[in-house]
Every structure is written in structure tokens, then in C-alpha cells.
């Protein structure tokens, strides 16, 4: 949206979201959502992001003095836009290489048809399987034992449709798929029967699988085609996802992802430059590109060499590490909740409290504040709280005055402090305020409930015994 455009409310009917469908990124989709093809290895030129570089201004910016060249938004308004890198040769996706191997075991290397035919005794049962993931695994279990394309079953010596060609044995080692082809005694050229399958070769085979065979394997032709499991066009995340940190006046520390994208660009440009040279030089540059693309996605794969910074040797934090686990984006940021104005202590029982009451220690009540707007009805009470100040309960800690100016009552003379209608007083917690009380693990909605505050001496939360059941609480220190 360009600056100055007047926002108008949509006239579309409200719809209920029933489900979210995930799929694989189509190279055409990556091209469509990209605003720039990234090919310049240099990130900055005299402090300004280079055109076609990893921090090209068309992808957005985190610099306060600059604006996004695509939407004209500043660092607060622009969420960023994706770019892309055209790879000189396709590479394996580290998360899908096992899946690629499974699919290759299910199709013929020559005609690219399924190794299992409708004459097979398990064909009908496999066709009835609905779960896509389960379906691929079941088809793989049957096809991995089929050695010749077109045989009706393992014991049959008669061929149905198919090429009749013997199939290679496949195994994954690191970021490679190794193929061992059967030796033909009449053909001496088959003696050297072991070789690595390139991602380009696998891409051609997967791309030639028919729509019907893809569906039989459990793939969706709109959301996830088999050939999309191999990377031929790499999306580049926008700079707001990987902001740089200024260490001094002229020193800029780039994010790990930016560093990795730069390494990918260097390896990709070197590979493109040497495509017409000797095979061993091409292979060396290709393996480097494969390594950097893999460690951009996952740098913690077992048995895989770790990508590190050249200075300091610190391991790169890859995309997977940012998403997974308790500290990741999903559990740590999206699902995890962090709040201000909260307190934590041990609970003890108090049968004298009402069911909806919560005994709160005075020390906590003096620390947690509630903002209350000054009105004609409460101005006298607010003045008393301000006079009591932050160290006498019930009192107040801050005043938010005209223009949002904050006054800390720890340093002000409370008796001389002026308040007026519309001011906001950050007052202490007092009796009959409503608060939310939570005990982990929060397994159901009754793990967080509302209570009326009753300020009490000592240092523990007090709770009526009859309220402990929904919290699954006891009084042994939990």
C-alpha cells in the first residue's frame, strides 16, 4: 500500500476459518512473490544496501533513515518482502532428501512409471488408503522389493506394462543419494555401476511422474508436487526477519541468515562461472552450494558438518533452530505468553477466604500497579493514594500526566504533586480488585481463573481449599 492511500473498510462477508492447508512452495510461486532476484554478493556500498544484494531496499529495511522501495513504508510500517536466488544447479532440500529417496524407489528410472501395477495383489488395497503420508509409506514398503519395472509381483516372470528394466539400489549418505545399478554381463560399461545421483537428475525423474501416479503416492498436484521437494529457486527472507545489529559507529554485525545467504551467493556465482570447466571443479563448487543451502535450513543434522562463522567459529543458527523447541518462534513467541504486572510465589490454604477470593501478600500488592483514570468521582481517593506514595499501602507509584509525561513518585514530593481529571494513576493493588490466577501446567481453561484480591500479611498466596481442584494444586510447595 502506497503512503497517503485512504483505508476503506472491506465490503466482503465475514467467513469462518475452518482449516489451514500447508503445502510446498512452487518455484513459480517463489518467483511471483519475489520482488528482486538476488545475485550481488556485496551487501552494502558506502553504507547503502546494494541493488540486487541480500539487503536490497526492495525487500524492506530496518534502517530508520531509509524506506522500502516496494511499498514506501519505513521500518515500522513495512513487514518486508521476499526475494529469490536462481540456483545455477538444483540442490537437495535437507528436510526432504529421505522423502526423495523413497519416491525414487517407487518409480522406474527409465520410464518414470510406478513400479507397482494394477496387476499386483496389493494394488487395490493401496488405492483405498486415504492418509497421504501413510499411503506413501505403504507404497514404498511394496515397491522397495520390486527389482524390475513392469513385473506383476516378485514371483512373476511375466511383464505387464513397464520398461522391463532392472532398478538400482539406493541409499542416502549425508547430502547425497548413491545408486548401485545392476551389472549386465553382456555390457562391459555396466561394471562401473555405482555413482551419486545429482539433484538435477532426480528433479527430471520426479518431474516426469504422471499426475495419476503422484496421486497414488499421496501427493496433491496443486499443493505439493514431487519435483518441488528439490530446490531450484531459493527464497530469500526479507531483512526485517534477519535484522543487523550496529556494534559501533561503523561496525555492523549481520544476522546468521544474512551471512549464510551471502555464502550461498558466492558458491552459486562460482558454480555458474565454472559450469564449462572440468567435472571435478564443477563438483567441488556444487558440493559447497549444497552444503550452504542445507545448513541455511538445518545446521544441527546428525552426521552433517556444522556451518560456522569464519571469525570466532560460532555455529550458524539456521531456520529450523529458530522455529523448533521451547525457545523457538512457535512455542516461545506465538504460543508462549509473557506478561508484565505479574507475580509468582508459593500457595498456602486459608479456609476463611471466600471461594472467589485470593490472598495476596502486601509486598506484592505494593509492587503490582493498576492504572486508574482520575475522574470527578474518584479524585479525592486518588489524591490520598498519591500522598501515601509508593512505600505505604495503599498508595501509588506513578502518575501519567499531560502528553503522556510520567512522574515517578519515588522521587517526587507526594504532598505537593498536582493531579487533574484525565490523569492516570498507577496505584497499588487493593482489596476487591480482580486478577487472573494461574497454576502451571495450564492443561485446561480452569487453570486460569479470576479472583477478588484480599491483601494479607506474610509472603504466600492464600487460596480456599475448595478451589484447589481445577488448579490441581496442593500445599507442598507447588
Curated annotation (Swiss-Prot):
Phosphorylation activates POL II. Zn(2+) 2 binds at residues 108, 111, 149. One of its GO terms (biological process) is DNA-templated transcription. Zn(2+) 1 binds at residues 68, 71, 78, 81. InterPro entries: DNA-dir_RpoC_beta_prime, RNA_pol_asu, RNA_pol_N, RNA_pol_Rpb1_1, RNA_pol_Rpb1_clamp_domain. It catalyses: RNA(n) + a ribonucleoside 5'-triphosphate = RNA(n+1) + diphosphate. Its main location: nucleus. GO terms for cellular component: mitochondrion; plastid; RNA polymerase II, core complex. Gene3D superfamilies: 2.40.40.20, RNA polymerase ii (3.30.1490.180), RNA polymerase II, clamp domain (4.10.860.120). Mg(2+) 2 binds at residues 474, 476. It holds the Pfam family RNA_pol_Rpb1_1. It is found in: Nucleus. This is DNA-directed RNA polymerase II subunit RPB1. It comes from Euplotoides octocarinatus (Freshwater ciliate).
Amino acid at each position: 500500500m502506497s503512503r497517503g492511500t485512504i483505508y476503506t473498510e472491506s465490503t466482503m462477508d465475514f467467513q469462518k476459518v475452518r482449516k489451514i492447508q500447508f503445502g510446498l512452495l512452487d518455484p513459480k510461486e517463489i518467483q511471483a512473490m519475489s520482488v528482486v532476484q538476488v545475485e550481488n554478493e556485496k551487501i552494502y556500498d558506502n553504507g547503502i544496501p546494494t541493488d540486487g544484494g541480500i539487503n536490497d531496499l526492495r525487500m524492506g529495511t530496518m534502517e530508520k533513515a531509509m524506506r522500502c522501495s516496494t511499498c514506501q513504508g519505513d521500518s515500522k510500517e513495512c513487514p518486508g518482502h521476499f526475494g529469490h536466488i536462481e540456483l545455477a544447479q538444483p540442490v537437495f532440500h535437507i528436510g526432504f532428501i529421505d522423502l526423495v529417496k523413497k519416491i525414487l524407489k517407487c518409480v522406474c528410472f527409465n520410464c518414470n512409471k510406478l513400479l507397482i501395477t494394477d496387476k499386483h495383489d496389493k494394488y487395490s488395497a493401496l488405492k483405498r488408503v486415504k492418509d497421504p503420508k501413510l499411503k506413501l509409506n505403504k507404497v514404498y514398503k511394496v515397491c522397495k522389493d520390486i527389482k524390475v519395472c513392469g513385473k506383476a509381483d516378485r514371483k512373476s516372470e511375466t511383464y505387464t506394462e513397464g520398461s522391463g528394466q532392472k532398478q538400482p539400489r539406493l541409499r542416502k549418505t549425508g547430502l547425497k543419494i548413491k545408486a548401485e545399478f545392476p551389472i549386465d554381463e553382456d555390457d562391459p560399461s555396466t561394471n562401473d555401476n555405482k555413482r551419486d545421483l545429482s539433484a538435477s537428475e532426480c528433479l527430471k525423474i520426479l518431474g516426469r511422474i504422471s499426475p495419476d501416479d503422484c496421486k497414488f503416492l499421496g501427493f496433491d498436484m496443486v499443493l505439493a508436487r514431487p519435483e518441488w521437494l528439490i530446490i531450484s529457486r531459493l527464497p530469500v527472507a526479507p531483512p526485517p526477519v534477519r535484522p543487523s545489529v550496529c556494534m559501533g559507529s561503523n561496525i555492523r554485525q549481520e544476522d546468521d541468515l544474512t551471512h549464510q545467504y551471502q555464502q550461498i551467493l558466492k558458491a552459486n556465482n562460482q558454480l555458474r562461472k565454472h559450469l564449462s570447466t572440468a567435472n571435478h571443479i564443477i563438483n567441488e563448487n556444487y558440493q559447497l552450494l549444497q552444503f550452504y543451502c542445507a545448513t541455511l535450513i538445518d545446521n544441527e543434522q546428525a552426521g552433517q558438518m556444522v556451518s560456522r562463522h569464519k571469525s570466532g567459529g560460532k555455529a550458524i543458527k539456521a531456520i529450523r533452530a529458530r522455529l523448533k523447541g521451547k525457545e523457538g518462534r512457535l512455542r516461545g513467541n506465538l504460543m508462549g505468553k509473557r506478561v508484565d504486572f505479574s507475580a509468582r510465589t508459593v500457595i498456602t490454604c486459608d479456609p476463611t477466604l471466600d471461594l472467589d477470593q485470593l490472598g495476596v501478600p502486601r509486598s506484592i500488592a505494593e509492587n503490582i500497579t493498576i492504572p486508574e483514570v482520575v475522574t470527578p468521582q474518584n479524585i479525592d481517593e486518588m489524591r490520598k493514594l498519591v500522598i501515601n506514595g509508593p512505600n505505604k499501602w495503599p498508595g501509588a507509584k506513578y502518575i501519567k500526566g499531560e502528553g503522556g509525561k510520567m512522574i515517578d513518585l519515588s522521587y517526587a514530593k507526594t504532598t505537593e504533586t498536582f493531579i487533574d481529571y484525565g490523569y492516570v494513576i498507577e496505584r497499588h493493588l487493593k482489596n476487591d480488585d480482580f486478577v487472573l490466577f494461574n497454576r502451571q501446567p495450564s492443561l485446561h481453561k480452569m487453570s486460569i481463573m479470576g479472583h477478588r484480591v484480599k491483601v494479607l500479611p506474610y509472603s504466600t498466596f492464600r487460596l480456599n481449599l475448595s478451589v484447589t481442584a481445577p488448579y490441581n494444586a496442593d500445599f507442598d510447595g507447588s
